Amino acid sequence: MEIRAEEISEIIRKQIKEYGKEVEVAETGTIISVGDGIARIHGLDKAMAGELLEFPGGVSGMVLNLEEDNVGAAILGEDNENIKEGTTVKRTGRIVEVPVGEALIGRVVNAIGQPIDGKGPINTSTFGKVEVKAPGIVKRKSVHQPMQTGLKAIDAMVPVGRGQRELIIGDRQTGKTAVAIDTIINQKGGDLICIYVAIGQKRSTVAQVVSKLQEHGAMDYTIIVSASASEPAPLQFIAPYTGVTMGEYFRDNGKHALIIYDDLSKQAVAYRQLSLLLRRPPGREAYPGDVFYLHSRLLERAAKLSDDCGAGSLTALPIIETQAGDVSAYIPTNVISITDGQIYLESDLFYSGVRPAINVGLSVSRVGGSAQVKAMKQVAGTLRLNLAQYREMAAFAQFGSDLDKATQMQLARGERLVEILKQPQYRPIPNEKQVLIIFAANNGYVDDYPVASLRRYESELYSFFDGRKADILAELRDKKAIDDDLKGKIVAALDEFKKEFTA
């Protein structure tokens, strides 16, 4: 084969013409030490707090500590063999962002918004910053719309409003997650988008939650963010912020969202681990000094926005696990003081068969009263007081046998009220039916029946109204209040049902 000089020179000329000189300028640093999800990096002098860093192997990181001669960063992903001492880390100049938008609904994502459900990539071009300031005072409006949980005990006595932060607190195995999942299932057919953030949970538990939600058709309006127990502490720390960023997208677009953090005790533990590894000084129970701010800045992002800002809302139900019922520990007291009330679940009640195991005396909703449906407020006004008096009397009645008639009647009524408020899991009840059963219990319609037959009384009452008195249910649903005319109809219908029901 003959080599022709003019051809070679032509090719070289062409290549020189097409040669484009691109210089990429990036600020880089070198890893000094790495381990337990924390890297110390030298040379990133201009890095910002909370900035996204690029580690080798496509792993991201987040700047947490800015020190004189190095930067402490959390690695948002599994430590891999590419991340070691001496490797190069790049600045991005961006704060950590996660995907947001409608495309996430029905998906299961990890702590940085990447899909983990095997359904392919998430098609969204919208991203939200993980750390943003909560809405100011002017942008907010007081809570005034109800957020129905479908649980009689909560909707009647500890009502939750849209934009509220209501803590669910209790020991392990008292049904905290069950309350949250029932609330999600109850939103079916409504306008609420739900986000469930699982922090430090077993993967099998998260899979169980997903399958239950699919079974009840609730994944059609739910996003699940999972940072399981086997994932590094930085991911467990950032997962709640990822979830709230996704919820804020709906809130800021005039929609309504509900976010559940299950649970924030595990996030605090992950943050404690990060802080100690970053050599921040420990405080009470070895938590860092800013652990209060960790939760307050997260929960303050749940809000009811004013009409000028689109009137959207983000409701938060954080969960905290107590140890042996100790509500006065550090993290529980912090979160109680941040939230607008708490639902306290008690293991003694749970094991005695009262489920949901809500302790009415210690549970409170500080702002939900103004959001409660008027009809429920009318029938449940005395319920809380009656139950509290019953509990007190029942405690005294253990010591004395000679009780007068009035006390015996009050104890019998209280026993029936407790029974009426019990509810099986995954069976939320619409508000109008809750109003009916509580109205019946308060007005003595169940006093003559044995406690054991009340579960059957309740289900047959619902069937009776569904089949023959659907107009009353519709009127309750539309009016949301009981006037004299409607009260007369309900009383007549309950009298009619009483003749038919046999215990």
UniProtKB/Swiss-Prot annotation:
* Membrane topology designation: Peripheral membrane protein
Q: Which Pfam families match?
A: ATP-synt_ab, ATP-synt_ab_C, ATP-synt_ab_N
Assigned EC number: 7.1.2.2
Required for activity, annotated site positions: 363
Q: Which reaction does it catalyse?
A: ATP + H2O + 4 H(+)(in) = ADP + phosphate + 5 H(+)(out)
Q: What class of enzyme is it?
A: translocase
Cross-referenced CDD domains, in alphabetical order?
Answer: ATP-synt_F1_alpha_C (cd18113), ATP-synt_F1_alpha_N (cd18116), F1-ATPase_alpha_CD (cd01132)
> Record keywords: Cell division included?
no
Q: Which InterPro entries does this entry report, sorted A to Z?
A: ATP_synth_asu-like_sf, ATP_synth_asu_C, ATP_synth_asu_C_sf, ATP_synth_F1_a_nt-bd_dom, ATP_synth_F1_asu, ATPase_a/bsu_AS, ATPase_F1/V1/A1_a/bsu_N, ATPase_F1/V1/A1_a/bsu_N_sf
Cellular location(s):
Cell inner membrane
Q: What does this protein do?
A: Produces ATP from ADP in the presence of a proton gradient across the membrane. The alpha chain is a regulatory subunit.
The UniProt similarity line reads:
Belongs to the ATPase alpha/beta chains family.
Q: How does it assemble?
A: F-type ATPases have 2 components, CF(1) - the catalytic core - and CF(0) - the membrane proton channel. CF(1) has five subunits: alpha(3), beta(3), gamma(1), delta(1), epsilon(1). CF(0) has three main subunits: a(1), b(2) and c(9-12). The alpha and beta chains form an alternating ring which encloses part of the gamma chain. CF(1) is attached to CF(0) by a central stalk formed by the gamma and epsilon chains, while a peripheral stalk is formed by the delta and b chains.
Name listed for the protein in its UniProt record: ATP synthase subunit alpha
Encoding gene, per UniProt annotation: atpA
